[in-house]
């Protein structure tokens, strides 16, 4: 981690994954566990080190790789990994992961992070990197021996580059990437929903969230020859104090926090929901702000029709001494532009939030969630004195946020995309404004 030896990850044949923390790391001023689910205190002491074993160790590392089998197979072929298992893949591509760790074969030196090693790219070079992102190695070709081997979790096609001295670069050795490039999604899911404009849509959603005053990653739309990408500035990277090199910032997503594999990222599949995450955020350095903003984000996702707010799309920054706080938001996509019936569309009555709103029963369907559900859940989470202000603030901010963003859309931004999202959000807040805080007896009988 930033040149410091943390420990070893092993997968002995026939036994559980094993993580051994080095004592020097544990005792260091900068030392911290890799995850809240893998604390120092729960490790078994022995031979000057501490060891953890089991499913939580395996889950932590599995969450560092993409959770898309097609992407995993392509990475295996491209880099000559033995298999698509997390251990074999990360042995090949674990030099630049989400967060701060670098995974290297035993005995390999990590390199000097204080010295930037990179190959500068022109526009054609960046375009070529983006084109090659989705390509596998052809039969008979040698594995890609580029020294920069990165692993970015998630289900979307993406790559990463370094921004150095005003130019895009391929980093090498210990030098980290600073920006993630996300390619258009295309047709996605079982219904093959048309998300070919996902780059513009995600930019729109991220900038809308910024207009509401919530912490969110900086994004821009990049075009390089015939290639287009959403460029996200990494908040797990920061310049060193002297400004001459980059440091990696430890972080983990909420699947890692809770020790769960990525196939349980949705609450309906056994992942953490709003209540579990709100409980964890009680231990944050910024507990009050982090908890209120997390609840506010869930309500805003309902307004936006953003259905992918699962456990991997919320993260913590890990600080020395076991301290932590929430990271900025990222990976926000509204489904409003595809709400209709027909080919490549999503039935709006089937649109579900990733985390249930609990108020008596558990509610996932967006159309079935009402103001009184949000109020009831907020009260059960200890936000009774804040929920009315949060709801009214979102109602009042929505027209201002939409107007402000409309004035700074890029020149070639598709106006119909903005209008669809704006109309859907406006309808949602009007409904929120007219509904009561308490469900009436008449509505109970009606249902």
Regions found by a protein language model. Name each.
Residues 1-447:
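Phosphate/dinucleotide-binding and metal-coordinating scaffold of catalytic cores
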